Amino acid sequence: MTKHGKRIRGIQETYDLAKSYSLGEAIDILKQCPTVRFDQTVDVSVKLGIDPRKSDQQVRGSVSLPHGTGKVLRILVFAAGDKAAEAIEAGADFVGSDDLVEKIKGGWVDFDVAVATPDMMREVGKLGKVLGPRNLMPTPKAGTVTTDVVKTIAELRKGKIEFKADRAGVCNVGVAKLSFDSAQIKENVEALCAALVKAKPATAKGQYLVNFTISSTMGPGVTVDTRELIAL
């Protein structure tokens, strides 16, 4: 058996695949798994009780995680004039207007989040086919279309993230690094869950948090009891 196979078998022996755990227990399971040579990301995958085909059941928003994600973001800002100068001063990694639009049209997407001033959206909107599938398109709902670029950049640096349900009604979000202590991971997950519940469409019927799984990059996916999360 390969080292990879032995590691997976060892992981599976630490918990019951058919069981749902409390959030604290699930985090403990991830922490107990064999280590790897890099700091793994803690991801959550949430199946929502929505019909994503309906325009009034789209789930998208943002939340400031109390302990950040542990990831150093590469922030791009579409802006011109004074707002571009403000973005540069605030520490954005890439700042520009038409030049960045053309660069992205050519296939460059070497950044993690994009912010735009409202006056830039006419041109930025032309990048929908490139940015949309990568969840990089600035939107007012996510707070990434703004006149206050300084505040937005600061919030992103501190741990503000965007979440969006895909075509299957699933939200996949990185919420922490496995090196965070258990309480920090738990508080970040709870903040995300509270934001998801707040974003529940009024027309969504039945159970909203259908399935919730937490995992690490090289670790298992552990099912979390949604009854605990709904009560947050």
Curated annotation (Swiss-Prot):
GO cellular component: large ribosomal subunit
Gene Ontology biological process terms in this record: regulation of translation; translation
The keyword Ribosomal protein belongs to this UniProt entry's keyword annotation: yes
InterPro entries (alphabetical): Ribosom_uL1_bac-type, Ribosomal_uL1, Ribosomal_uL1-like, Ribosomal_uL1/biogenesis, Ribosomal_uL1_3-a/b-sand, Ribosomal_uL1_CS
Transmembrane segments: none
Matching Gene3D superfamilies: 3.30.190.20, 3.40.50.790
Database matches in PROSITE patterns: RIBOSOMAL_L1
GO terms of molecular function: rRNA binding; structural constituent of ribosome; tRNA binding
Subunit structure: Part of the 50S ribosomal subunit.
NCBIfam families in the record: rplA_bact
Function: Binds directly to 23S rRNA. The L1 stalk is quite mobile in the ribosome, and is involved in E site tRNA release. Protein L1 is also a translational repressor protein, it controls the translation of the L11 operon by binding to its mRNA.
Family: Belongs to the universal ribosomal protein uL1 family.
Protein name per Swiss-Prot or TrEMBL: Large ribosomal subunit protein uL1
Organism: Chlamydia trachomatis serovar L2b (strain UCH-1/proctitis)
Lineage: Bacteria, Pseudomonadati, Chlamydiota, Chlamydiia, Chlamydiales
Gene for this chain: rplA
